[in-house]
Amino acid sequence: MYDKNGDEIPIFVDQADLDRFKQLSQQLAGCHSSLEVMPDQLPGVFNDGNFTLGESIADLGGVEIAFEAYTNRLKRQGFEGNQLRLQQQRFYLAYAHLWQAKYNALYAQELTLGRNELVMGKNVHSLERERVNGVVMNTDAWYDLFDVKPGDKLYRKPEERVHIW
């Protein structure tokens, strides 16, 4: 990172900051590694959370920042109560729609495991469904807006949710 004069700004102030970042990063990698890819067609094939970690951190941070900025703008425009809630829900629906995709098992397996030379090779991004699910299940607002409770498929306990930035 750089300041307005082009001088480098350290991302981590001290070793404790760096250690906490590494701990949270591993939590996020574990979360993404728990996501099964196309369970009906590829049972037992899971996302590689360590391989996709950099992009998963970027996705999570980006969504959290965008949601906060969007919410602040809505409030400045006078949205409140149920109307604010509806617009916030639409944010998450738009995010999911953005990553909507359809692919076959061979494609999914290749991008997840990188075992077939016919396709592009292993991808540093999670597949679309896992990319969305891995983000929303770590954002507290999603639980409130969609009334996600223990026992629901994408539920994570509050202490297990990862907030890096």
Language-model features, listed with the residues they occupy:
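Zinc-dependent metallohydrolase catalytic domains
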Residues: 1-165
